[in-house]
Regions:
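Short, well-structured alpha-helical interface segments that form or flank functional binding sites
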Residues: 2-5, 85, 102
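Phosphate-binding site of ATP-dependent enzymes
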Residues: 1-57
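C-terminal active-site "lid" helix and adjoining low-complexity regulatory extension at the edge
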Residues: 65-91, 95-100, 109-151
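Acidic, metal/cofactor-coordinating or nucleic-acid-engaging core segments within structured domains
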Residues: 59, 63
């Protein structure tokens, strides 16, 4: 959406000596909106490891499932600019925060084609169940880590 600040939300998990991406999605505002927040009508769409969007996009309303944006552009297969750079930057920054296991990162690409970190979410990284298991292939590992920390 050209009227809103659209952001890439990555959720990363720090394992012992590496950082992995749990989920990645593009958050987009709707026509005329300046923000991409789902709570005010925005939508989100999964980003595959290749950096391409995977339809559909979802909104906050349970019936809010979209194959295309308000301008008629189909989401499926659209390439997110500088996606690999965004992933690399999130992983690199996460390694500097050794006591934080899961972080939600919000990035955008500015009009100069530069990756910009908007914020990181330490307390509530966001859970986007509609695009698949929130903890992905690391579910068992993360749950075991939580169980061990309770002892």
């Amino acid at each position: 959406n050209p009227t809103s600040l659209n952001t890439v939300r990555l959720t990363t998990f720090r394992r012992e000596n590496e950082v992995v991406v749990l989920t990645s999605l593009l958050r987009m505002g709707r026509k005329g909106s300046k923000v991409d927040n789902v709570s005010v009508g925005g939508v989100f769409c999964e980003i595959e490891n290749s950096g391409k969007l995977k339809s559909p996009a979802y909104g906050i309303n349970p019936t809010g499932v979209y194959e295309e944006n308000d301008f008629g552009l189909k989401y499926d297969g659209v390439v997110v600019p500088l996606f690999q750079q965004i992933v690399d930057e999130a992983k690199s920054m996460h390694m500097t925060l050794p006591y934080t296991r899961i972080i939600g990162w919000d990035f955008t690409v500015n009009d100069k084609n530069e990756v910009v970190l908007i914020e990181l979410n330490l307390h509530s990284p966001g859970v986007y169940q509609l695009i698949g298991p929130a903890l992905g292939n690391y579910t068992d590992e993360i749950l075991e880590m939580v169980r061990q920390s309770k002892k």
